[in-house]
């Protein structure tokens, strides 16, 4: 049986035969210790979103762009750009909430499903071959989310 993972693996191996997948078999799961209506939430995406005033991600880097961008909590979609070329943007251009569901999360706050949203959200690039620098940046973002008293990171992969 051919799965999308096998197809993806074959495509990556064709472009980068030296690439070794990172397996996270021992990733700790952190259970949610309180109900969502008592939690502060931040969105973290791998969609390559950035503010028009920021430096775009560089999709031409051999191992991928491992940096991240801060997206303010009061973001206006008109100020966002996408520099990720490894997925179809058709639906994202139709409704950016498909990738960055800030409007849906605001509705959940109004309905009392979530206590609040973070002052900052984060965007990474997907399609990363060298995960070592990515892990360094992810730890910085994790620390920043803790400093902001964020309880839940809602990941939207691209």
Where would I find each of the regions flagged by the language model?
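Metallocofactor- and cofactor-centric catalytic cores in central/energy metabolism, strongly enriched
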Residues: 1-158
């Amino acid at each position: 049986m051919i799965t999308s993972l096998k197809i993806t693996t074959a495509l990556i191996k064709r472009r980068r035969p030296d690439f070794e997948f990172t397996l996270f078999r021992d990733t700790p799961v952190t259970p949610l210790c309180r109900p969502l209506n008592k939690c502060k939430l931040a969105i973290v995406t791998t969609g390559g979103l950035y503010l028009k005033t920021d430096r775009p991600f560089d999709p031409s880097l051999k191992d991928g762009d491992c940096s991240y961008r801060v997206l303010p909590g009061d973001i206006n979609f008109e100020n966002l750009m996408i520099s990720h070329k490894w997925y179809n943007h058709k639906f994202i251009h139709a409704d950016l909430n498909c990738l960055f569901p800030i409007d849906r999360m605001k509705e959940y706050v109004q309905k009392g499903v979530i206590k609040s949203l973070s002052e900052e959200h984060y965007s990474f690039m997907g399609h990363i071959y060298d995960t070592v620098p990515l892990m360094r940046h992810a730890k910085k973002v994790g620390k920043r989310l803790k400093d902001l008293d964020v309880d839940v990171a809602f990941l939207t992969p691209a």
